[in-house]
């Protein structure tokens, strides 16, 4: 019987690999043999439940699973919000397909400790000259050398290979799990099992860390402070104006040890902050990079992004208003809970405030999160100012949306500090405020250089049906037509507007930012 199970488990693996290789549009195309082997090891337990099935049953089951997960999120992005800690749920035997456009280095190193980063670089032959290099500096170095390191490890860089954790000790793995509130069997001493637990949770934890860092920096109101002197260094007086709570939160976010006996003394906290002021400079650059990514122009985005941004923005804003007016279904599906664990405290409060839900000012983040879950189907009672005028007419143009977002800019973007620091970024995007005609023209010219496959994917993102007999010129013309109405230079055909309105008004809102 054991031999039979083994044979069928191996057969399940081959069926899986066959399906992977047959799917030419998937991220698996870029995976190396080592990545595939690692994937199968990661999903070993899930595969075992199919070991008693016949080969034909396995093929049937594998086909059904493939159809079900034709476009799933990567398995590391499956986030259950059943508790305040990160989920430990098993992603399923075929729960992973990822994006071939984004290497895991985008998020992999964000929650690593300084020592782990330094050891990783050293083990993989990357010299770090500065013994006092900050964590952000080490993360940057790791990302810059990621392709070279991945190649040496026989990994593609598009799967969180276990080999990236070779430099971690058992203690390192346990510390990471403990520091990030991940439940695991403390009796487990197997490094392989601990690596597996870290891999299951590291993407979700990285997303949460990003949101928490963003929330903290926004709460510090950096935009209205003169932080840098004329030489570009942190001013000596910056921390004097921070409250004790702000200082404590900032120091703890950078893993600075605080003497518990001195934790309430403002002078002590200021002194500790000044000793670690280099971290604030890292925060500023991180924040500006984040803002740049969030507000970057259409021209720096992928074709898929451009094709979806208008629909997604319109869907989101329309559904927000329609939910307030009681026009949509009162049930928010479980997708709402995806990412809830990464919400900062302010966002949780905003969600509750907009629905008139009362909560104690002393509520912990966990208590607020639980209240949000219970209140997820409550209708909005407080409609943010100036929303209505943009929703009474369901045919608003891109200019309307641009105007709305311009009205809602964060104070940070209007500040002199932002203008000063962003001047380098402005050089990159100096033409982004040109007339919409110029944007559309630029895209039209760009289409000429795209491959036929690029054009097909771009049109697919708009939901445009394409005949199999279409030539490249046909695809270019279709791309131009759909891009022109996206940017407002040509009005979308009436039948398209009708279909989009039906689609937009029928979707349920998942939450709001």
Curated annotation (Swiss-Prot):
Coiled coil location: none
Annotated keywords: Phosphoprotein
Biological processes, Gene Ontology terms: protein localization to site of double-strand break; reciprocal meiotic recombination
InterPro entries membership: Ish1/Msc1-like (IPR018803)
Transmembrane segments: none
Phosphothreonine carried by residues: 237
GO CC terms: endoplasmic reticulum; mitochondrion; nuclear envelope; plasma membrane
Modified residues (Phosphoserine): 243
Note: Originally MSC1 was identified in a screen for mutants that show an increase in meiotic unequal sister-chromatid recombination (SCR). Present with 1070 molecules/cell in log phase SD medium.
Name of the featured protein: Meiotic sister chromatid recombination protein 1
Species in which this protein is naturally found: Saccharomyces cerevisiae (strain ATCC 204508 / S288c)
